[in-house]
C-alpha cells in the first residue's frame, strides 16, 4: 500500500494546486519499470516529510489531461508544486538523496 495518495484529473486542482503546503507529484504508470523502482523511495519521502510536504501520485494512463498539461513525456517524472506553481522537476528513477535534496530547496 502506497503512502502517497492517488490524484486524478478531477482532483488535481484541489489536491495539488490549492494545497497550503508544498506537494510532490509522482507521475507514473503501472507498466513502467523505473516507476516501480522509484515508488518505495517516494513512499519513504512521504513518511520522512509527512509534516512538511504532501506526496501524491498521478497514473498517467488513467489521467492523461494532467500529464499532457504539464508536458509529461518520460516517466517517472516527479514535480514539486508550491503555492499552485510548479517549482521543480526531477525526471527518472533517482536516489532518495537526490529527491530529498531537491525537495529541501523548496521548504
UniProtKB/Swiss-Prot annotation:
Cross-referenced CDD domains: TRX_family (cd02947)
Single annotated GO MF: protein-disulfide reductase activity
Gene3D superfamilies cross-referenced by the UniProt entry: Glutaredoxin (3.40.30.10)
Keyword entries, A-Z: Disulfide bond, Electron transport, Redox-active center, Transport
The Thioredoxin domain, residue ranges: 2-107
GO cellular component, one term: cytoplasm
InterPro entries tied to this protein: Thioredoxin, Thioredoxin-like_sf, Thioredoxin_CS, Thioredoxin_domain
Entries under PROSITE patterns matching the protein: THIOREDOXIN_1, THIOREDOXIN_2
Disulphide bonds in the chain: 32-35
Domain of life: Bacteria
PANTHER family recorded: GEO12009P1
Task performed by this protein: Participates in various redox reactions through the reversible oxidation of its active center dithiol to a disulfide and catalyzes dithiol-disulfide exchange reactions.
Family: Belongs to the thioredoxin family.
Protein's name in the database: Thioredoxin 1
Naturally occurring in which organism (per UniProt): Synechococcus elongatus (strain ATCC 33912 / PCC 7942 / FACHB-805)
Lineage: Bacteria, Bacillati, Cyanobacteriota, Cyanophyceae, Synechococcales
Amino acid at each position: 500500500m502506497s503512502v502517497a495518495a492517488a490524484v486524478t484529473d478531477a482532483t488535481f486542482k484541489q489536491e495539488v494546486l490549492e494545497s497550503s503546503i508544498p506537494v510532490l507529484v509522482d507521475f507514473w504508470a503501472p507498466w513502467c519499470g523505473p516507476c516501480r523502482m522509484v515508488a518505495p523511495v517516494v513512499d519513504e519521502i512521504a513518511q520522512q516529510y509527512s509534516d512538511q510536504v504532501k506526496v501524491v501520485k498521478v497514473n498517467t494512463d488513467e489521467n492523461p489531461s494532467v500529464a499532457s498539461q504539464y508536458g509529461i513525456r518520460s516517466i517517472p517524472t516527479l514535480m514539486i508544486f508550491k503555492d499552485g506553481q510548479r517549482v521543480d522537476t526531477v525526471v527518472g528513477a533517482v536516489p532518495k538523496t537526490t529527491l530529498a535534496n531537491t525537495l529541501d530547496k523548496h521548504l
